[in-house]
Amino acid sequence: MTARPSAPTAVDAVARALRDELDAVRTRAGGSAAPRVLDVGGGSGTWAVPLAAQGCEVTVVDSSANALAVLRSRARDAGVADRVRAVQGDVDALADIADGNGGADLVLGHGLLEYVDDPVAAVRALAGAAAPGSAVSVLVAGRWAAVLGRVVAGRVAEARRLLADPLGRWGAGDPLLRRMDTDEVRALLERDGGLVVEQVRGHRVLADLVPETPDGPSGAADLAALEELAGQTPPLRDLASRIHVVARRPGPR
């Protein structure tokens, strides 16, 4: 994904949702402690380093030693190495990795469910790692955007296979184990994870269809506003490249 430097981008909707949640965490705590964030599959720190820069204590769990090395380097460069903890492991080991502190204030599973062998077990592990009343944020590859993208690229046979496949894959060479639609993600989090879904948004609904930033002083801002609205509006929301869901673990906050 290439950010548009001159104006807010589609990723801002996800980042804003996380900031809102963390502001609520700080308010409940009276500002007495840094929010605890657990980023599962967080790799090189795309989300972890900015969150640490916002004052969070972030633990990143990833199976790749190389990605975690990049994370440590980025955290040092950003001056937040003391607020980022890197742990090599996978979602199956969350129960052993988590501190005995009652769970995280925010759990991220961004770009995770596409790759795990057992998404039900993964979602249950994410839910179990969140403190009661805390949020789980999931970002997963959207099925319908992948179909349309292949049609536009002239890869019609792949689009047909992807549309017909129960897991939303285009073939044996597909690097993803699955893609999902909004109903599938919601059911996975609610039915299998025991979470309460609060927000479902499309992430990059229309922005990827625009070859360049629109002209004019308000062009980029207009695109960002359109993207924000489309991400909340079915059926456009359901055509997004990725689906963002914020769900909450039941319990007192």
PLM feature spans:
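Conserved alpha-helix/loop element of class I SAM-dependent methyltransferases that forms part
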Residues: 8-33
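Conserved class I S-adenosyl-L-methionine
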Residues: 33-41, 135-164
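Class I SAM-dependent methyltransferase SAM/SAH-binding core
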Residues: 46, 50-93
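A conserved beta-strand element that flanks and buttresses the S-adenosyl-L-methionine
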Residues: 108
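A short glycine-rich, Lys/Arg-flanked "PGG" loop and its adjoining helix->strand segment in the class I
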Residues: 120-135
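Short alpha-helix
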Residues: 174-193, 200
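Conserved Class I S-adenosyl-L-methionine
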Residues: 199-253
